Amino acid sequence: IDYAMAHGVNYYDTAWPYHRGVSESVVGKALQQYPRESFYLADKMPTYLLPTREQAREIFEKQLEKCKVEYFDYYLLHAIRFVEDYQTVYEKNGVLDYLLEQKKQGRIRNLGWSFYGNTETLEYLLSRDVQWDFAMVQLNYHDMLHEYKIAPHQARFIPKDPAPTQWMFEKMQQSGLPLIVMEPLLGGRLARLNKKALAVLQTERPQASAASWAFRYV
């Protein structure tokens, strides 16, 4: 993180389960030496735990404590896959109302969601009467041109019929909702192209890395 800060990176993303539950604490410790206004911090409500409102409150308070901050710049409903999950956790359990209250109090600056679902789920999310500030979706040049490819570490999370990337991107453009991109390197695979594929790119920009092409795309 020190290297990243020194080279202009100012957006940091963490979550409750990352690195076996220690990511938030590590990120908080690393960032505490820097002025709070010098970086943007994103964290997430663990949808997969199906938390109640009270459990969500406990999780949120613990996240602030672990990250050593008084507010999150970006806060996400983590990994929305199915309509039923969203309805159970965020509507029936009252977790969305709780998070909206935290936003009113200034403890969440921007509220959004990360998406791993099918077309039905995306259309449902966009139809809700909620003033979302942003959404996070998987976007890279491979998925825009070919069938959606699941990164290995995501396999157990993704529905069998994920929304096609091109369709999803067009749907998000129509909604006007700002996007944050995840998986620009497709789990690192677009940074490790075979020699034949890399040679095609190098005919245009010989010194550019495979990773730089992927980042330029998004």
Predicted segments with their positions:
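A structural motif
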Residues: V9, V69-F72, I108, W132
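Conserved, mostly hydrophobic/aromatic
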Residues: A4, Y12, V27, L41, ...
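N-terminal binding-site loop/beta-alpha segment at the start of enzyme catalytic domains
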Residues: I1-F39, E70, Y98, K104
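Active-site groove signature of glycoside hydrolases
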Residues: L64-Q87
